[in-house]
A protein has these predicted regions:
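Residues within membrane-spanning alpha-helices of integral membrane proteins
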Residues: 4, 47, 100-104, 108, ...
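Small-residue-rich hydrophobic segments that form or flank transmembrane alpha-helices
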Residues: 4-72, 129-134, 142-201, 205, ...
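Transmembrane helix exit motif
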Residues: 54-62, 85, 93, 99-124, ...
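Membrane-interface helix termini and inter-helical loops of multi-pass transporters
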Residues: 85-94, 180-192, 239-241
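Small-residue-rich segments of transmembrane alpha-helices in multi-pass membrane proteins
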Residues: 31-32, 36-40, 75-83, 107, ...
C-alpha cells in the first residue's frame, strides 16, 4: 500500500512537470516503477500510464492542436512504434541510451543555434522525424525529449506545442500498447496498475495548465533546456551502470 501511495505522489508531480514542458513523466517515474513493480512490468505499466497522460494533455489544450502537424508526425510514427516494440529485445539498450543521452545534451546549444538562424522544418521533414522517433519510442521507455526539437523547429510553442506533441505521442503509445498486448505483455493486473499510475498523471496535467498560461516564452524555453539536460545525463548514467 505504501508503495502505491509513493507511486501516485510521484505520478502527480510527474504529471505536473510533463504538463508544463510537454514530456518528462516517463523519466521521473521509471525508477519508482522498477522499484515498486520490477523491471519487467515497469515498461508496459508506463506505456498505459503515458496513454492516459497524453489524453489529459490533449483534453486540456484541445483547441490549440495543430492537426496538420499531428497527422504528418503520427501517421508514419504509429506503425514505426509498433515495429520498434517488436525489436525491443534485439537491440542493445546501452548503446541506445548513450546515443540518446548525447543527442539530448547536444540539442541544448543546438536548439539555440537553430533559433538564432530561424531554422524551420516543413511537414514532410516532420513526417520523417515522426517515423524515426516512433521507432525509438517502441524500442526504449521514453523518447519524449526527442519530439521537443522536432515540434519547436516546426514553429510550435506553449499550448500549441503541448497539445500537438501530446496528440502525436498518444498515437505512438497506443500503437506500442497494442503491440505489447499482442505479445502477451499486458495481463489484467498490469493494465490496472498502469491505469492507477495514469490517473495521477492526468490530474497533474490539468493542474499544470494554469502554470503554462502564466509562463513567458523565455521561461518555457529554459524549462525545455533543463529537461533535456536532465534527460541526457540520466540516460548516460543508466548506460554506465
Amino acid at each position: 500500500m505504501t508503495s502505491y501511495i509513493f507511486v501516485l505522489l510521484v505520478g502527480l508531480v510527474a504529471g505536473c512537470v510533463s504538463g508544463v514542458i510537454g514530456t518528462g513523466s516517463s523519466i521521473m517515474l521509471l525508477p519508482v516503477l522498477v522499484f515498486s513493480f520490477g523491471p519487467k512490468q515497469a515498461v508496459p505499466i508506463m506505456a498505459i500510464a503515458a496513454v492516459m497522460a497524453n489524453v489529459a494533455r490533449v483534453a486540456a489544450w484541445w483547441r490549440e492542436v495543430d492537426w496538420r502537424a499531428f497527422a504528418a508526425y503520427a501517421l508514419p510514427g504509429a506503425p514505426a512504434a509498433a515495429l520498434g516494440a517488436r525489436t525491443l529485445l534485439v537491440l542493445p539498450p546501452r548503446v541506445i541510451d548513450v546515443a540518446l543521452g548525447l543527442f539530448f545534451l547536444s540539442m541544448i546549444p543546438g536548439r539555440r543555434w537553430l533559433a538564432r538562424r530561424n531554422f524551420r522544418i516543413r511537414l514532410w521533414q516532420l513526417a520523417i522525424a515522426g517515423a524515426a522517433i516512433g521507432f525509438l519510442t517502441g524500442v526504449v521507455l521514453s523518447t519524449g525529449p526527442l519530439s521537443v526539437p522536432a515540434f519547436t523547429a516546426y514553429g510550435l510553442s506553449m499550448g500549441a506545442f503541448l497539445s500537438t506533441e501530446a496528440a502525436s505521442s498518444l498515437a505512438l503509445y497506443i500503437s506500442k500498447v497494442v503491440t505489447f498486448r499482442e505479445l502477451g505483455a499486458l495481463p489484467p493486473s498490469t493494465i490496472l496498475q498502469g491505469m492507477i499510475v495514469g490517473a495521477s498523471l492526468m490530474v497533474g496535467a490539468f493542474v499544470a495548465k494554469r502554470a503554462v498560461l502564466r509562463m513567458s516564452r523565455a521561461l518555457f524555453q529554459h524549462l525545455l533546456d533543463g529537461l533535456m539536460l536532465c534527460s541526457g545525463l540520466s540516460l548516460l548514467w543508466a548506460a554506465l551502470e
